[in-house]
């Protein structure tokens, strides 16, 4: 069990993030074209899983925009934005913000992602949604970085996530 903070109160999540060096669980998610996808669809690519409660909250929205911007020069990295939002919400957001470098993925059709990745919030007003986390995988789906953001209102450490991929990022690039 892990705990996250939302508006000053601690809430439990189901399990823990996958451990460093472990093989990431492969689960099915739904893309904006309503197709089932899994990590196997991105085999041979390094992957950043940006996991969050909802695309329609300011911090979540900013994280997607920042990861999209960071991905502009790194087409060999699959940027997977994962939430329980409907695929239509991801599609709308991508269109509104002209996002071309990230893949919006919904867990709505397939149970298990939140449990397998230890991000499903178990209690409180966000129960059933995902806690904010980033998991970085190498080409073979081995976990090379993981971050469970303690306070759900905080952004992930973008620089550390990219550093795990061997990519240096200027913090000024993160300004949107």
Spans of features found by a protein language model:
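Chalcogenol-based redox active-site neighborhoods
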Residues: 1-176
């Amino acid at each position: 069990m892990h705990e996250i903070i939302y508006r000053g109160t601690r809430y439990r999540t189901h399990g823990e993030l996958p451990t460093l060096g472990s093989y990431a669980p492969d689960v099915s998610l739904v893309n904006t074209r309503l197709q089932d996808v899994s990590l196997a669809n991105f085999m041979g690519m390094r992957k950043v899983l940006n996991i969050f409660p909802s695309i329609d909250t300011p911090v979540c929205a900013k994280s997607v925009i920042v990861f999209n911007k960071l991905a502009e020069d790194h087409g060999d990295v699959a940027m997977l934005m994962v939430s329980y939002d409907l695929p239509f919400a991801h599609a709308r957001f991508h269109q509104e913000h002209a996002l071309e470098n990230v893949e919006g993925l919904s867990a709505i059709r397939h149970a298990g992602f939140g449990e397998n990745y230890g991000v499903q919030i178990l209690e409180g007003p966000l129960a059933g949604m995902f806690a904010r986390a980033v998991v970085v995988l190498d080409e073979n789906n081995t976990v090379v970085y993981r971050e469970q953001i303690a306070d759900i209102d905080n952004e992930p450490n973008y620089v550390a996530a990219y550093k795990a991929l061997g990519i240096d990022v200027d913090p000024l690039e993160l300004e949107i």
